[in-house]
Amino acid sequence: MSRPERWTTAVLDVEAPGGLAVVQGDQGFLLDANGVMFPRGWLAGQDLPVQSEHGIGYFEGEPVYLLVLERSVAVEGCAWQGLRQFMLEGDFAVFQMLGYAAQVSTWAREHRFCGACGRATVQIRGERAMFCEHDNLRLYPRISPSMIVLVTRGDEILLARSPRFVTGMYSALAGFVEPGESAEDCVHREVMEEVQVRIKNLRYRGSQCWPFPHSMMLGFHAEYESGEIVPQAEEIEDARWFHVDDLPPLPANRSIARYLIEAYLAERSGAPEPVLPG
């Protein structure tokens, strides 16, 4: 999959003049009728409670910075919108930019102080890292690898729902990779833990950044081998086989979960394969 051209990440010098900025507070990202990117000079005059600033990349060639606020505040003519809403609608390249910004913001908030000694850290110029001088310790943004797998049995697909899902929605099985575990081992383990089913013919299908708050989703397809579905207590509210012509409400169109399902439906029908966003 080719790298997105409209949005590219970079470590920019916050001392450089000009450019645009996105603003994140505890209510999401600031936006107005023109979008989420504001001239840095204009933002400097808004008396915002800025906790930190980061140069995050280029959007259509324009340098973009991130202002992380101590809290969300009212700005005339503007509103706040959560990251998930940007994922569901609008320009996907903007969501990619904001997803990156959100992960940088999470990292900056969580590593203001050293976890070893408790002293304040400083940003390393030209590198996406915080530094504790006392412990000579570099602290990088956290990325949590996780897997998501669509298990199929001919014209049936195995879908499950978590108690956290919106009412009626089902999705593919997913879980986090454990230390010392390969992604493939994780798939087999999670499927067994969540529904007591054995799988075979595992195929990697693609990956997607999932900035809620810092996951990297590794997508797989697998075929059913054996076992009867037994949902994992407290984790899985319901799990069952669905015929491809009679599916329940599914995850958002731009999610890797939806892509895995749509890709299998296309494969069964001979339709063109969908494109995985991101």
Swiss-Prot record:
Report the cofactor remark.
Divalent metal cations. Mg(2+) or Mn(2+). Binds 1 zinc ion per subunit.
- Write the gene name: nudC
Name used for this protein in its record:
NAD-capped RNA hydrolase NudC
Q: Name one GO biological process term.
A: NADH metabolic process
List ligand-binding residues for a divalent metal cation 2. Answer: E190
Identify the EC number(s).
3.6.1.-, 3.6.1.22
Instruction: Please tell me the species this chain comes from.
Output: Pseudomonas syringae pv. syringae (strain B728a)
An example Pfam family from this entry, by short name, is Zn_ribbon_NUD
Q: How does it assemble?
A: Homodimer.
